[in-house]
């Protein structure tokens, strides 16, 4: 089998012809290309219609846009948090590391207990998608659960990279969309810690402008937020949006939070290094080069695995 992570940007995933298609979620993104959510749903509908009848779509039916795309499809398997889903996670609990465990029901009946070694409720959903795929292919249930337990994550996805000199934990994450940001921060909140710091680098001017209000609403779980300059990637600064405007809107939305704009990476590292305390969590967040700040903060002897 060949497994690939497909991206919808520029309809690039429509060049694929998979036998199994997994829909984790559908959300407003890449609006510089799609313009609106209806166009995004049309592309996803085309994607699932390209899957042959002898194949299957495995999808999270708790997402309303996914449900829209799945309408009328017979060759589908669903997962989620309700017994109407084919696979349903119940009795979800988290340990002090934020690692979840849950009971997995299949078609309304208890199937197995799942324990993960990666944090966050979003990984409960991810694990159900992986489980459903392997189960469909005939893999033994015990093999699936053992494999899920052994999985410890991947680069730049809630990636523990080390500690600061005083003992704050440094985590790097690729999240650059409001939905991803909330999932990452929620995962961090489940870990035993003191203050939660986030160093956020917005990614592209078009995304920042199109989802401005959503970004403003996304950081209610943090204690300290530092916003760096927007990472331009492929774009030019012609959209009348800035990190300073984000800072102002976020300060108004979250007056009880420590929120500030800082453009220089070295200054950010110096400030956080002086002010973050023992057992705090520091997340460098974004799809650009914000991870460099974590490297500045980290002591060499504490390098993460």
Predicted regions and their residues:
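Acidic, Mg2+-coordinating active-site environments of NTP-dependent enzymes
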Residues: 20-170, 193, 247-248
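Short active-site oxyanion
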Residues: 1, 53-57, 258-259, 280
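Short glycine/proline-enriched loop/turn "hinge" motifs that connect secondary-structure elements
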Residues: 12-19
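Short glycine-rich, flexible loops that bind phosphorylated cofactors or substrates
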Residues: 11-12, 30, 66, 233-234, ...
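ATP-dependent carboxylate-amine ligase
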Residues: 45, 73-75, 109, 119-122, ...
């Amino acid at each position: 089998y060949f497994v690939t992570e497909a991206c919808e940007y520029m309809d690039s995933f429509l060049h694929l012809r998979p036998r199994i298609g997994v829909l984790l979620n559908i959300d407003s993104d890449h609006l510089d290309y799609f313009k609106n959510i209806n166009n995004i749903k049309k592309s996803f509908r085309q994607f699932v219609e390209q899957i042959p009848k002898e194949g299957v779509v495995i999808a999270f039916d708790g997402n309303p846009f996914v449900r829209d795309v799945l309408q009328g499809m017979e060759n589908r398997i669903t997962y989620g948090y309700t017994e109407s889903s084919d696979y349903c996670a119940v009795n979800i609990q988290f340990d002090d590391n934020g690692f979840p465990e849950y009971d997995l029901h299949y078609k309304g009946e208890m199937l197995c207990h799942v324990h993960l070694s990666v944090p966050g409720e979003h990984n409960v959903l991810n694990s159900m998608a992986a489980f459903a795929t392997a189960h469909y292919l005939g893999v033994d249930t015990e093999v699936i659960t053992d494999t899920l337990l052994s999985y410890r994550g991947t680069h730049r996805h809630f990636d523990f990279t080390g500690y600061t000199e005083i003992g704050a934990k440094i985590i790097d994450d690729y999240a650059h969309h409001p939905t991803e940001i909330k999932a990452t921060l929620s995962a961090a909140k489940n870990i035993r810690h003191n203050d939660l710091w986030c160093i956020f680098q917005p990614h592209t001017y078009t995304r920042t402008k199109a989802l401005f209000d959503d970004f403003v609403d996304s950081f209610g779980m943090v204690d300290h937020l530092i916003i760096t300059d927007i990472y331009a990637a492929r774009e030019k600064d012609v959209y009348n949006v800035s990190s300073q405007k984000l800072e102002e809107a976020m300060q108004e939305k979250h007056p009880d939070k420590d929120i500030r704009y800082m453009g220089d990476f070295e200054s950010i590292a110096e400030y956080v290094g002086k002010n973050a305390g023992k057992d705090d969590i520091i997340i460098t967040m974004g799809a650009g080069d914000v991870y460099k700040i974590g490297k500045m903060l980290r002591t060499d002897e504490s390098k993460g695995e």
